[in-house]
Amino acid sequence: MKLPNEIDEYLASRNFSENTRSNYHYDLVSLQAFFEDKSLTTENLELYKIQISNLSPAAQRRKISSANQYLLFLYQRQKVDQYFKIKQVVQKKSQTAQSYHPMIKEFPEFYGPLTCPGQFLALLILEFGLNFAEIQKLKWENFNWNFKYLTIEKAGIKRVLPIREKFAIRVKAINNADELFAKSRQFLYTELKKFTNYSSKEIREQYILHQVKAGKSIYELATLLGLTTITTLEKYYR
């Protein structure tokens, strides 16, 4: 029995975000290519598992999960006459010991009355996961205070990030933000350092940790951060 190509139909049946859809498409096209000259059997699925064993454990688990969901879809739609499932990769103790789980911080001091540019920068990084390069490209008009969202454009791709009320009530009265956004990276770095000993990288990581805690999938988080791959995020999901 051959593996039928129902990738487009499968993706159309799922309510995926554009980024998640793209990642599923990539994984399933790779699976389809592997079975191009092979029959769909338990033995060949094991060979597929061996082929991807050089990837990180997180990447292996993602690909196996994608394949298993697709195989279940095919069986439920009677495209195959047997339900196949690849056994998931087991996380070894050594991998658990090496997992990366920094402590989540709340930064209550960031949410006091706004007193300096560095505090505003810290809030932008903590609330939206922005880096200095992205902050420099911001315009005050990107903030929609009526509907509470921030629009960011990067490499021709727009992403829309929700604005929380605790951020809005502290910063929406600012009238000279564009002056700050136009400053050099060194200026932004210096102003942030005046306000807090935490670096922009450390604060941005806290944004990531809070999103993981909130239940965002690795693909959803990559979309929020404007990333084209999930490689740098895998350590937070091990």
Curated annotation (Swiss-Prot):
Residues 1-75 form the Core-binding (CB) domain. Residues 90-238 form the Tyr recombinase domain. Its main location: cytoplasm. It comes from the Bacteria. It is found in: Cytoplasm. Keywords: Cytoplasm, DNA recombination, DNA-binding. GO terms for molecular function: DNA binding; tyrosine-based site-specific recombinase activity. GO terms for biological process: DNA transposition. The active site is at 154, 204, 236 (o-(3'-phospho-dna)-tyrosine intermediate). GO terms for cellular component: cytoplasm. Belongs to the 'phage' integrase family. XerD-like subfamily. NCBIfam families: PRK02436.1 (NF002685). Putative tyrosine recombinase. Not involved in the cutting and rejoining of the recombining DNA molecules on dif(SL) site. This is Tyrosine recombinase XerD-like. The lineage of its organism: Bacteria, Bacillati, Bacillota, Bacilli, Lactobacillales.
